[in-house]
Amino acid sequence: MAVMIKKSDFLGIPSEEYRGILSLRYQVFKRRLEWDLVSEDNLESDEYDNSNAEYIYACDDAEEVNGCWRLLPTTGDYMLKTVFPELLGDQVAPRDPNIVELSRFAVGKNSSKINNSASEITMKLFQAIYKHAVSQGITEYVTVTSIAIERFLKRIKVPCHRIGDKEIHLLGNTRSVVLSMPINDQFRKAVSN
Protein backbone atom coordinates (compact mmCIF):
# COMPACT_ATOMS: atom_id res chain seq x y z
CA MET A 1 0.00 0.00 0.00
CA ALA A 2 1.30 3.41 -0.93
CA VAL A 3 0.90 6.16 1.63
CA MET A 4 0.13 9.58 0.19
CA ILE A 5 0.46 12.60 2.47
CA LYS A 6 -1.84 15.50 1.71
CA LYS A 7 -2.23 18.97 3.14
CA SER A 8 -5.18 21.32 2.98
CA ASP A 9 -6.81 24.16 4.79
CA PHE A 10 -10.40 23.92 6.02
CA LEU A 11 -11.87 25.83 3.10
CA GLY A 12 -9.99 23.95 0.40
CA ILE A 13 -10.12 20.34 1.54
CA PRO A 14 -12.08 18.01 -0.76
CA SER A 15 -15.34 17.04 0.94
CA GLU A 16 -14.76 13.26 0.76
CA GLU A 17 -11.30 13.61 2.30
CA TYR A 18 -12.68 15.86 5.04
CA ARG A 19 -15.38 13.27 5.78
CA GLY A 20 -12.61 10.66 5.89
CA ILE A 21 -10.72 12.69 8.49
CA LEU A 22 -13.85 13.15 10.62
CA SER A 23 -14.73 9.46 10.31
CA LEU A 24 -11.22 8.43 11.38
CA ARG A 25 -11.37 10.83 14.32
CA TYR A 26 -14.73 9.32 15.34
CA GLN A 27 -13.26 5.81 15.20
CA VAL A 28 -10.18 6.78 17.22
CA PHE A 29 -11.46 9.30 19.75
CA LYS A 30 -15.11 8.36 20.26
CA ARG A 31 -15.06 4.58 19.76
CA ARG A 32 -11.52 3.44 20.64
CA LEU A 33 -10.59 5.97 23.34
CA GLU A 34 -14.20 6.55 24.46
CA TRP A 35 -13.79 10.30 24.75
CA ASP A 36 -16.96 12.19 25.61
CA LEU A 37 -17.23 14.07 22.32
CA VAL A 38 -20.18 15.27 20.33
CA SER A 39 -20.51 13.34 17.09
CA GLU A 40 -23.07 12.99 14.35
CA ASP A 41 -23.36 10.30 11.65
CA ASN A 42 -20.18 8.61 12.94
CA LEU A 43 -18.18 11.80 12.31
CA GLU A 44 -16.28 13.77 14.97
CA SER A 45 -15.81 17.49 14.58
CA ASP A 46 -15.73 20.48 16.87
CA GLU A 47 -15.66 24.26 16.82
CA TYR A 48 -11.93 24.22 15.96
CA ASP A 49 -12.67 22.71 12.56
CA ASN A 50 -13.02 26.16 11.07
CA SER A 51 -11.36 28.50 8.60
CA ASN A 52 -8.25 28.74 10.83
CA ALA A 53 -7.60 24.98 10.69
CA GLU A 54 -5.17 23.17 8.44
CA TYR A 55 -5.00 19.41 8.01
CA ILE A 56 -2.13 17.09 7.21
CA TYR A 57 -3.41 13.62 6.47
CA ALA A 58 -2.47 10.26 4.99
CA CYS A 59 -4.45 8.44 2.31
CA ASP A 60 -3.97 4.97 0.87
CA ASP A 61 -4.23 3.87 -2.78
CA ALA A 62 -8.03 3.85 -2.52
CA GLU A 63 -8.00 7.46 -1.20
CA GLU A 64 -9.12 6.28 2.25
CA VAL A 65 -7.88 8.54 5.06
CA ASN A 66 -5.88 6.49 7.56
CA GLY A 67 -4.01 9.16 9.51
CA CYS A 68 -4.39 12.86 10.30
CA TRP A 69 -3.32 15.95 12.20
CA ARG A 70 -5.17 19.20 12.69
CA LEU A 71 -3.07 22.37 12.97
CA LEU A 72 -4.31 25.58 14.56
CA PRO A 73 -2.53 28.93 14.87
CA THR A 74 -1.92 30.11 18.41
CA THR A 75 -2.87 33.65 17.42
CA GLY A 76 -6.56 32.75 17.75
CA ASP A 77 -8.60 30.27 19.73
CA TYR A 78 -7.09 26.82 20.03
CA MET A 79 -7.66 23.87 22.33
CA LEU A 80 -4.85 24.35 24.86
CA LYS A 81 -5.77 28.00 25.36
CA THR A 82 -9.55 27.65 25.35
CA VAL A 83 -10.43 24.10 26.44
CA PHE A 84 -7.49 23.12 28.64
CA PRO A 85 -6.09 26.35 30.16
CA GLU A 86 -5.77 24.65 33.56
CA LEU A 87 -2.99 22.47 32.09
CA LEU A 88 -0.86 25.58 31.70
CA GLY A 89 -0.56 26.21 35.44
CA ASP A 90 0.81 29.75 35.81
CA GLN A 91 2.12 29.85 32.24
CA VAL A 92 0.41 32.06 29.67
CA ALA A 93 -0.92 30.28 26.59
CA PRO A 94 1.40 30.78 23.61
CA ARG A 95 0.26 33.47 21.18
CA ASP A 96 2.76 33.66 18.38
CA PRO A 97 2.41 33.36 14.59
CA ASN A 98 5.41 31.00 14.62
CA ILE A 99 3.90 28.60 17.18
CA VAL A 100 1.15 26.23 16.02
CA GLU A 101 -1.00 23.80 17.97
CA LEU A 102 -1.18 20.19 16.81
CA SER A 103 -4.39 18.38 17.71
CA ARG A 104 -6.56 15.41 16.77
CA PHE A 105 -3.62 13.17 15.81
CA ALA A 106 -5.13 9.87 14.72
CA VAL A 107 -3.96 6.76 12.90
CA GLY A 108 -6.44 4.07 11.95
CA LYS A 109 -6.25 0.88 13.96
CA ASN A 110 -7.19 -1.20 10.93
CA SER A 111 -4.12 0.04 9.07
CA SER A 112 -1.78 -1.62 11.54
CA LYS A 113 -3.85 -4.79 11.92
CA ILE A 114 -4.42 -5.41 8.24
CA ASN A 115 -1.12 -4.49 6.67
CA ASN A 116 1.24 -3.41 9.45
CA SER A 117 1.57 0.09 7.99
CA ALA A 118 0.69 2.20 11.02
CA SER A 119 4.36 2.82 11.79
CA GLU A 120 4.94 4.00 8.22
CA ILE A 121 1.85 6.22 8.35
CA THR A 122 2.86 7.65 11.71
CA MET A 123 6.40 8.42 10.55
CA LYS A 124 5.18 9.98 7.30
CA LEU A 125 2.80 12.21 9.27
CA PHE A 126 5.65 13.34 11.54
CA GLN A 127 7.85 13.98 8.49
CA ALA A 128 5.03 16.02 6.99
CA ILE A 129 4.55 18.23 10.05
CA TYR A 130 8.31 18.86 10.13
CA LYS A 131 8.37 19.83 6.43
CA HIS A 132 5.27 21.98 6.88
CA ALA A 133 6.89 23.80 9.80
CA VAL A 134 10.05 24.54 7.83
CA SER A 135 8.10 25.76 4.80
CA GLN A 136 5.81 28.00 6.89
CA GLY A 137 8.37 29.45 9.31
CA ILE A 138 6.89 27.58 12.28
CA THR A 139 9.44 27.40 15.10
CA GLU A 140 7.48 25.29 17.58
CA TYR A 141 4.47 23.04 17.88
CA VAL A 142 2.46 22.72 21.09
CA THR A 143 0.09 19.87 21.77
CA VAL A 144 -2.05 18.30 24.45
CA THR A 145 -1.32 14.62 23.97
CA SER A 146 -1.21 11.25 25.67
CA ILE A 147 1.80 10.05 27.60
CA ALA A 148 1.95 7.18 25.09
CA ILE A 149 2.65 9.71 22.32
CA GLU A 150 5.16 11.48 24.58
CA ARG A 151 7.00 8.15 25.05
CA PHE A 152 6.87 7.53 21.30
CA LEU A 153 8.36 10.96 20.55
CA LYS A 154 11.19 10.35 23.00
CA ARG A 155 11.81 6.89 21.55
CA ILE A 156 12.19 8.22 17.99
CA LYS A 157 14.13 11.21 19.36
CA VAL A 158 11.75 13.98 18.27
CA PRO A 159 12.62 16.90 20.56
CA CYS A 160 9.86 17.58 23.05
CA HIS A 161 9.45 18.77 26.59
CA ARG A 162 6.53 19.34 28.89
CA ILE A 163 5.23 22.84 29.33
CA GLY A 164 2.54 24.39 31.50
CA ASP A 165 2.27 22.72 34.88
CA LYS A 166 4.25 19.73 33.47
CA GLU A 167 1.92 17.30 35.24
CA ILE A 168 0.04 14.28 33.93
CA HIS A 169 -3.70 14.95 33.70
CA LEU A 170 -6.51 12.48 33.17
CA LEU A 171 -8.54 13.75 30.22
CA GLY A 172 -11.37 11.28 29.86
CA ASN A 173 -9.59 7.94 30.13
CA THR A 174 -6.36 9.28 28.66
CA ARG A 175 -3.33 10.26 30.73
CA SER A 176 -2.26 13.48 29.04
CA VAL A 177 0.45 16.14 29.09
CA VAL A 178 1.18 19.40 27.29
CA LEU A 179 4.25 19.27 25.07
CA SER A 180 6.37 21.72 23.16
CA MET A 181 8.09 20.38 20.05
CA PRO A 182 10.76 22.79 18.78
CA ILE A 183 11.48 22.67 15.06
CA ASN A 184 15.20 22.07 14.82
CA ASP A 185 17.87 19.80 13.37
CA GLN A 186 17.16 17.11 15.96
CA PHE A 187 13.54 16.95 14.76
CA ARG A 188 14.73 16.72 11.15
CA LYS A 189 17.09 13.85 11.96
CA ALA A 190 14.44 12.02 13.98
CA VAL A 191 11.99 11.92 11.08
CA SER A 192 14.44 11.50 8.20
CA ASN A 193 14.49 8.22 6.31
Curated annotation (Swiss-Prot):
Q: Which UniProt keywords apply?
A: Autoinducer synthesis, Luminescence, Quorum sensing, S-adenosyl-L-methionine, Transferase
Q: Which reaction does it catalyse?
A: a fatty acyl-[ACP] + S-adenosyl-L-methionine = an N-acyl-L-homoserine lactone + S-methyl-5'-thioadenosine + holo-[ACP] + H(+)
Disulfide bonds, paired cysteine numbers = none
Q: What's an example GO BP annotation here?
A: signal transduction
EC number annotated for this UniProt entry: 2.3.1.184
Q: Name one GO molecular function term.
A: N-acyl homoserine lactone synthase activity
The EC class name is transferase
Q: Sorted alphabetically, which InterPro entries does this protein's record hold?
A: Acyl_CoA_acyltransferase, Autoind_synth_CS, Autoind_synthase
Q: What does this protein do?
A: Required for the synthesis of OHHL (N-(3-oxohexanoyl)-L-homoserine lactone) also known as VAI or N-(beta-ketocaproyl)homoserine lactone or 3-oxo-N-(tetrahydro-2-oxo-3-furanyl)-hexanamide, an autoinducer molecule which binds to LuxR and thus acts in bioluminescence regulation.
Please report which protein family the annotation says this sequence is part of.
Answer: Belongs to the autoinducer synthase family.
Protein name, please? Answer: Acyl-homoserine-lactone synthase
What is the species of this protein? Aliivibrio fischeri (strain ATCC 700601 / ES114) (Vibrio fischeri)
Q: Gene encoding this chain?
A: luxI
